[in-house]
């Protein structure tokens, strides 16, 4: 197969998976590992991680590392086959929060979950196994399976993260379209006692209020920081209008 044909085939395979392809997927199309290595050496492909390549059509983004890691866990399966798995591997916890754009946690690892059992030797990848989550709690974010916003918050609460971080997550989650307070409260209910609340609803109310208070205080501090600048700007403007010879303001 000629170089142009190889690249065209790879682009077809990766068209629905962010311009990323694995050696296993390429092998199913008759493309050998050595061919991929040579294309990478020529600069036609970029290595994302072991056995995972970025194609020329790939557009870099903040979720590339998570996507590449997810694909590498089942390297011979195409993305549509992954979605059909009875026990799919989905992005969860801190990584899911990053994907959803909620909270301010910095994920120490790439975190995923599955209802079954799954192991990986990849460094920096953690998989929670034997999970039990309803189908509606797995959502697609640009084709990537991710735990829902509500379940993501609930998972992190069960991980006993600091209260302030959880408050940020709750506040951001409530701003997301389609996130219902009742769903969020239900997911937080198992952790309510740990955070000294009697119910999930009470915990949602308390954390939402705390986050709003912090936001208001931050906004007030930012406004106060502007006061000296405003005063200095006005003083400078006044000085420009002063005529020292005539001793008058113009």
Describe these PLM feature segments.
Residues 2-148, 155, 159-250:
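Short gly/ser-rich loop at a beta-strand->alpha-helix junction or flexible surface loop bordering the NTP-binding
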């Amino acid at each position: 197969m000629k170089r142009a044909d190889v690249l065209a085939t790879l682009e077809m395979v990766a068209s629905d998976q962010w311009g990323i392809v694995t050696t296993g997927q390429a092998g199913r199309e008759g493309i050998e590992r050595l061919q991929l290595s040579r294309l990478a050496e020529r600069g036609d492909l970029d290595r994302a991680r072991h056995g995972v390549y970025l194609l020329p059509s790939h557009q870099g983004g903040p979720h590339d590392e998570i996507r590449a890691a997810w694909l590498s866990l089942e390297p011979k399966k195409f993305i549509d086959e992954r979605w059909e798995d009875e026990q799919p591997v989905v992005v969860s916890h801190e990584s899911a929060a990053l994907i959803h754009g909620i909270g301010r946690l910095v994920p120490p690892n790439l975190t995923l979950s599955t209802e079954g059992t799954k192991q990986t030797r990849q460094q920096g990848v953690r998989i929670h196994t034997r999970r039990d989550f309803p189908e509606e709690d797995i959502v697609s974010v640009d084709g990537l399976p991710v735990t829902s916003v509500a379940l993501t918050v609930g998972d992190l609460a069960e991980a006993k993260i600091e209260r302030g971080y959880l408050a940020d997550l709750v506040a951001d989650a409530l701003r997301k379209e389609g996130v219902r307070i009742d769903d969020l409260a239900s997911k937080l209910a198992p952790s309510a006692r740990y955070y000294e609340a009697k119910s999930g609803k009470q915990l949602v109310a308390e954390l939402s209020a705390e986050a709003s208070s912090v936001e208001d205080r931050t906004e007030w501090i930012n406004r106060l920081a502007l006061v000296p600048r405003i005063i200095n700007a006005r003083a400078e403007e006044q000085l420009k209008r002063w005529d020292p010879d005539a001793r008058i303001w113009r």
